[in-house]
UniProtKB/Swiss-Prot annotation:
Its EC number is 1.7.1.13. PANTHER family: NADPH-DEPENDENT 7-CYANO-7-DEAZAGUANINE REDUCTASE. It catalyses: 7-aminomethyl-7-carbaguanine + 2 NADP(+) = 7-cyano-7-deazaguanine + 2 NADPH + 3 H(+). Substrate binds at V81, E82, S83, A218, E219. GO terms for cellular component: cytoplasm. The gene is queF. HAMAP family: QueF_type2. Homodimer. This is NADPH-dependent 7-cyano-7-deazaguanine reductase. NADPH binds at S83, K84, R247, G248. It is found in: Cytoplasm.
Length: 273
């Protein structure tokens, strides 16, 4: 289905009963073709981490239960899920009776797997689970005194490097883009680990800031950044992790790595989640 038929940016009615048809799928191949990424031979591994904060159902006695969920959609899935449709889908459980939280988890994972055409994993947690906030790992580059004047299309020509090999981790809280459909702002913290030619921090920060008025989905922004870095410095190793601020009861955190046996960064939330 074309993106114009999705519920993004439109007035919506919340369903009173569980409805899997609310989930709206978006083929990954469309945006990847734009980036020159071969969907049959991806240059990365990883997942999209979805944290959901509006999750409720009824137990067999009609008593409400509330919780939060974390779901992992593999990068090699055929489709992603449009975020507003996922929000409406989750809220369709509000008056739905389930035998247990495990049953709710099973239903959601099965539905997501069917829609994305991949094995989606995840877990649902009770609302009183203790949560600790973390901070981005690596060296923060945000305090550099730079002049910025490019806020249009992302400009990969801004990526410069030094002819010295390094293995390092850097981060920035200044990534911002806009939703492809609604133009609502997506605020992100990006953590980059790489081994290769040393990125020049000042020019790379300008590059990240050039996304400021870019209208793309979170997943496409992540893959654009990954691809641009790869093309610029041909690193021996590269991973990026973007933690987006919560919006509409959901935050989306894409992770991409050249390492097939990757380990996800800490699952501690950052302050904007």
């Amino acid at each position: 289905m074309p993106l114009s038929t999705s519920l993004l940016g439109k007035k919506s009615t919340y369903k009173d009963s569980y409805d899997v048809t609310l989930l709206f799928k978006i083929p990954r191949i469309n945006n990847r073709n734009e980036l020159g990424i071969n969907s049959n031979n991806l240059p990365f591994y990883g997942v999209d981490v979805w944290n959901t904060y509006e999750l409720s159902c009824l137990n067999k006695n009609g008593k409400p239960w509330v919780g939060v969920g974390t779901f992992y959609i593999p990068t090699d899935s055929e489709n992603i899920v449009e975020s507003k449709s996922f929000k409406l889908y989750l809220n369709s459980f509000n008056n739905f009776v389930v035998e247990s939280v495990k049953e709710l988890e099973r239903i959601i994972l099965q539905d997501l797997s069917n829609v994305t055409h991949a094995k989606v994993t995840g877990r649902i947690f009770p609302i009183n689970t203790k949560v600790e906030f973390g901070v981005p790992s690596g060296k923060n580059i945000d305090d550099l005194d730079i002049v910025c004047n490019n806020y249009g299309a992302p400009d990969n020509s801004l990526i410069e490097y030094e002819d010295v090999l390094v293995e390092e981790e850097i981060n920035s809280n200044l990534l911002k883009s806009n939703c492809l459909v609604t133009s609502q702002p997506d605020w992100g913290t990006i953590v980059i680990k790489y081994k290769g030619k040393k990125l020049k921090y000042d020019s790379f920060l300008k590059y990240l800031i050039s996304f400021r008025n870019c209208n793309e989905f979170a997943e496409q922004c992540a893959e654009r950044i990954f691809t641009d870095i790869q093309n610029a410095i041909s690193p021996d190793f590269l991973s990026i992790y973007i933690v987006y601020a919560r919006r509409g009861g959901i935050d989306i955190c894409p992770y991409r790595s050249t390492d097939k046996n990757y380990t996800l960064p800490s699952d501690k939330r950052f302050i904007r989640q």
